[in-house]
């Protein structure tokens, strides 16, 4: 069996700190995966996908290839986390909303009763 693939999927990832961050966290096999759009379907069909973070421009493009999409990610309309389960299903989540909420709470910001505009949807 081929080693599982772990990494950040996107285009033009030279600015990313993901590899050194994951290495520091004990994940030495994490890598940057830069693909052209036409290569995305074949890549996502690989059975040895372990786990991926997904960034632009593929946060929406990967969704049709996912077998299971978290309801919150479905509502947001984009995903940023993929995992191939042991049954072969490709599952997807969006951690942007939870991360944003956590950051706001840590900063002491409450949106309760407030009108808020968020530009973009993480895609």
Where are these regions (language model features)?
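Phosphate/diphosphate ligand-binding glycine-rich loop within oxidoreductases
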Residues: 2-109
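Short acidic/polar capping segments at secondary-structure boundaries
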Residues: 96, 122-123
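Glycine-rich Rossmann-fold phosphate-binding loop(s) that bind the pyrophosphate
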Residues: 11, 121-122
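Short helix-loop-beta connector
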Residues: 109-115
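Conserved beta-strand elements of the Class I
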Residues: 7, 117-119
């Amino acid at each position: 069996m081929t080693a599982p693939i772990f990494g950040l999927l996107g285009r033009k990832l030279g600015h990313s700190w993901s590899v050194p961050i994951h290495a520091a966290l004990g994940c030495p096999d994490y890598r940057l995966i830069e693909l052209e759009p036409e290569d995305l379907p074949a890549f996502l069909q690989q059975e040895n996908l372990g786990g991926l973070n997904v960034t632009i421009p593929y946060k929406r493009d990967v969704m049709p290839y996912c077998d299971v999409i978290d309801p919150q990610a479905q509502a947001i309309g984009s995903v940023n986390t993929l995992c191939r389960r042991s049954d072969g299903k490709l599952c997807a989540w969006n951690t942007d909303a939870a991360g944003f909420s956590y950051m706001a709470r840590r900063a002491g910001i409450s949106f309760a009763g407030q009108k808020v505009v968020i530009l973009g949807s993480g895609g």
